[in-house]
Every structure is written in C-alpha cells, then in structure tokens.
Amino acid sequence: VSGFHSCQKLAFVIQAEVNVGTDRKAENAEAMPLDNPASSPFWETVPLAQMSQSQWESLCDGCGRCCLNKVEDWDTGEIIWTDLACRLLDHESCRCKDYTNRFAKVPECLQLTPQSVEEITWLPPSCAYARLRDGKPLLWWHPLLSGDADTVHAAGISVRGRVKTEVGVPIEEYEEHLVSWPVTETGE
C-alpha cells in the first residue's frame, strides 16, 4: 500500500463489532418488510435516527466486515483493512460469539448508532447503515430484501472463509494481513 511503510506508522487499530448478534431474520415483525406490497418498507421511509431498536438491528446484514481490524496510516489518515477478525467473531456464522457482553470483553468495540454512522467514515460501501445514510438502496443480497440470512454468504459479501483471528497476531504483523476486498466488493 502506497505510503504504508511500516507498522510503526500505525496510529491505532480500529475494531468494531456492530450489530452482529444472533440471527434476527424473523425476530420481530416490526423490522421486517411490510406485508402490503403497495407500502414501502421501513428502511425506505423511516430515517435512521427514528428507527426502532428492532428496525435498526435488522439493518445489519451479518457480513462481519465491521468486525475486521483496521489500521490507520499516520501519514495519510487512510483506513486500511486487514483480514484479522475480532476474537469474538464466529468465522462461520459471521456473528459475535458474545453479543450481549461484547463491550465488556472488547473495550475498543464500537457501537453503531444513528449518530456514529454519520461520523464513521470507514464503514464498507456494502453496509446497509452507510448505504441508507448516503441515500442508496439496500443491495439484492441483503436479508431484508432476500428474506434469507444466507444470501449475504452466498453472494460472497460476508467474511466467511476469508479471515483469520486476531488472537496471537502482534500489531507489527498486521501489515502482512492488509486487504482491499472489504471496501471494493459490494455485490452490486
């Protein structure tokens, strides 16, 4: 990566486990598309800041990309992704192994809120929160559109089969794990 000379250039490691709890496919009817096809689904009509908790949580597609470690180049400020996943990420389901206690176990975990989504610039372009923030539609593979939580995996959007655990990897070796696919592959 141009301008990324050594791990000593790293300003910090960014981790986030955001809304990657249990499968919420049918957890709450309020979060699901409306039964009346003439009506628009909530994500097209309700602003992010006005969504209920269940609506907000259902926007998470379960890709696990937000749970990848990221580094910042001190010289450029560029956020660079790694293929190293948070220690709590289940690599098969792409969900947090301890969603309820994630902040206690991973203090650097960031919670997505309507306010933080406005401020966080590193969300992947496939992320529903970022897409809706930017006035873009959900993509075809999103579980709210497909009705199937597995389409995120079938479309190759999730981190399944593409990541390693951060456990035991010193920050000095993060440079060996840099990847671009979290921000270049969207499934559009």
Give the residues covered by each predicted segment:
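Short loop/turn segments that flank or connect secondary-structure elements
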Residues: 28-62, 71-188
